[in-house]
Regions:
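Glycine-rich phosphate-binding loop plus the immediately following alpha-helix
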Residues: 48, 126, 134-172, 262-265
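Adenine-nucleotide phosphate-binding core of ATP-dependent small-molecule kinases
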Residues: 190-219, 262
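Phosphate/pyrophosphate-binding loops at sites that engage ATP/ADP/AMP, CoA/4′-phosphopantetheine
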Residues: 57-70, 217-229
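A mobile "lid/hinge" subdomain adjacent to the ATP/sugar-phosphate binding pocket shared
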Residues: 166-204
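Short beta-strand-loop/turn "lid" adjacent to the catalytic site in phosphate-handling enzymes
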Residues: 33, 41-45, 60-95, 122-123
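Glycine-rich phosphate-binding loops at beta-strand->alpha-helix junctions
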Residues: 78, 223-250, 260-265
Length: 269
């Protein structure tokens, strides 16, 4: 899936490519010399991230000749290995997320990033040397997938609700989300079965799952951290409007205290 701006004159410009290689998706951005986002792509990797990397780079380089590419940087779980394969520069994903948030949204003081296999809380402060924000502190989830996007994916498959769009829209219909265990997928499944037996409406169960993930994040990743406002919510899960609602309510965020970046899935790249 691509998000493309007006095509620049490739004969007179040079570009940078950023790649975030995760367990679920490959996120690619093309930047110009002024760090403007020219194009960005979100591709599901389907268990073959390096095959998708090859296909995406081939596609980009057909449009933007290699002579115009000044640099390639990579991050994510597959970033270090891929950097060795294609000769790019590997960047730690905490640094990548903090840098993009600090440059594009300098007023943000907390970053919540939830991807397919991990979740992060990043604290920022204003850098007195420029107009950007800089990294102060961070925390990540444990090895358990309960606080990540895969938690929602697993539960969505169990109740046969497409995760891409319908899941979030369905959650927004709920006015009484039931409490569902969010710390363990096994317990969540048990709670879901229980609520189905009670004839709890499906949209309420879906909303309950969103709130379960948000509460799990608050009580684990953010348990010892102050969540300063405004909060920037990035990662693929930020596309889920049910999760946006859940974080607003769980963290008591009003109006512009919660920022959803236009390129929320590609912030790491």
């Amino acid at each position: 899936m691509a998000n493309t701006k007006a095509s620049p004159d490739v004969s007179v410009q040079s570009f940078y490519i950023g790649l975030d290689i995760g367990s679920v998706s490959l996120n690619t951005v093309l930047l110009d010399d002024n760090y403007n986002i020219i194009e960005d792509y979100y591709d599901y990797v389907h268990g073959k991230p390096f095959n998708m990397l090859y296909d995406r780079l081939s596609s980009v380089l057909k449009k933007y000749p290699s002579a115009t590419i000044k640099g390639i940087a990579l991050t994510g779980t597959g970033g270090k290995l891929a950097a060795g394969l294609i000769g790019g520069v590997f960047v730690n994903e905490i640094i990548a997320q903090a840098t993009s948030a600090g440059r594009l949204y300098p007023d943000a003081r907390t970053v919540i990033e939830i991807g397919g296999e991990d979740s992060k809380l990043i604290t920022l402060e204003k850098n007195p040397e420029d107009d950007h924000a800089r990294l102060v502190d961070f925390e990540m989830n444990s090895i358990c997938a309960a606080g990540t996007g895969s938690f929602l994916d697993q539960q969505a498959k169990r109740i046969n609700v497409p995760i891409e769009k319908e899941f979030g829209e369905m959650a927004m219909k709920s006015v009484n989300p039931p409490r569902i265990a969010g710390r363990c997928s096994v317990f969540a499944k048990s709670d879901m079965i229980h609520h189905q037996q009670l004839a709890t409406p499906l949209h309420d169960i879906v909303a309950g799952l969103c709130f379960a993930l948000a509460r799990n994040f608050r009580s684990t990743v953010a348990r010892s951290k102050e969540i300063k406002k405004p909060v920037l919510f990035s990662g693929g899960v930020a596309a889920n409007i049910g999760m946006v609602r859940a974080f607003r309510e769980v963290l008591d965020l009003k109006g512009d205290e919660l920022i959803i970046p236009a390129h929320h899935a590609s912030m790491g790249a």
